[in-house]
């Protein structure tokens, strides 16, 4: 079996050694190289042609943001941003340049190590395309007539999103007007500690009111509610947000099925469900109910 070839990029020797040690426990993965800064990473990608790159953000010589931009413009490869919770906002800038996903730097505990390895295996199989300068042309947003909203106030859009989702959301949401006539609720698979950073990043590029869903929020037209990763999100019969505790057995966080199923129960045929990107089967049951 062909092994997954990984390039590890981090200015911290200790961090590189930890990531390499974790990856080396899986016989399907081979670390083919390491780099201590973005400039070296760009060169190593060109030389080694890895299947996937783990990329730190804050580094000397060339930071991770610029390295991602250069790599995706010349030798496109799946990139997983590996950073700290404090770097959440900066990390999402990396997504806009073409990185596929982000995770918190793994610890030595077995659960985090297994999750990290699973993410590497998943992302390494995704086909990526050249991402010139990490920029897109966003179409001009035209606000909808206010009279429209009175006709469809009972409708809702529910989005299930996984790997590659933040990048896709950064394309879709900016094209919606600030008076979008119904609420949008989103369950995005994401590591704990990064939801607030994603929300702040999306606020910069869209006219919509975007927030992390909170217990008791009344869902309203023109607003986007993104589920926190620490709990699952439901819409209750009063059309308010209810947050549900995660269970140890839960594989996905937050759960797309939980959100979509609750939306189907409350809104019935006035709900629009969207599977934006997928990982495993999460969302399949919920979208069937919608």
Predicted features, each with a name:
Residues 2-4, 14-20, 28, 39-40, ...:
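Conserved acid/base catalytic micro-environments in cytosolic active-site loops
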Residues 10:
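Conserved acidic carboxylate
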Residues 23:
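Aromatic pocket-lining residues of Rossmann-like dinucleotide-binding sites
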Residues 36:
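Glycine-rich phosphate/oxyanion-binding loops and their immediately adjacent helices
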